[in-house]
Amino acid sequence: MIILYILLACISMPQSIAGDLNSLQTHSSNTHENYQLTEFFYHHNQTAISYPQLSGMNDSSKQEKLNKNIKTDALTVLHYYPDGAMTDGLTLDIKHTIKRMDRELLSIQYDGLGNVSGTAHPSNHFYTSTYLLTDGERIKLDQLVTLNEAFAETLKKKSKALSPAMEGYLDGLSNQDLLAKLQSADQLERIGEKNQSDVFSYWTEDSLGISIGVSHAQGDHAEFEVKTKDIIPFLKKPL
């Protein structure tokens, strides 16, 4: 597998297709289907959200479906605000990172800062979306992993906090409480609801990442990663 990054400058595209083209990430493999990821932006007033779009897939209908789903999911962060991008005094800057890109999975992380003038403090946003390249659908943690108390215990023992300040955080949760959080993971469709879940998952080449909402003083979100090899008994399919 070869991943090639090419930076493009001064290439503009019509606003109707979401702004300027800034970068190109090309994925090649020895499979029958190659694809490229290109960074696009949603802009409105002081709101900027970057998200990837695919090109070069052999199956154009699947590519169209994926691109529509990716953009829709990227913009769900707007549901945190009562009037979305039209919210008075809103400044929002969200960037995306490709966590995994192969013939089976595309896993995307979004993070950034949102602030409404006059509020006590800005919000550190973090959310993710993972797609099966075989059917173009977004897939949640519980569709890939058997979630039970044994998995919760394994996550507590084997995972590492990405922030040293959050080491030991999972140990402070009972297996039942941690399991309840994991079972609600990846519910992008509930963002903005009263009982929304702030738990998300992502995949890298060798790990599963879990993001859990925490207090603003702790950074609003905390991430933990566990090696895929350590959770093989819980996987519903090889990854």
State where each predicted segment sits.
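Compositionally biased intrinsically disordered regions enriched in Thr/Gly
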Residues: 14-239
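Sec-dependent N-terminal signal peptides of Gram-positive bacterial secreted proteins and lipoproteins
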Residues: 1-19
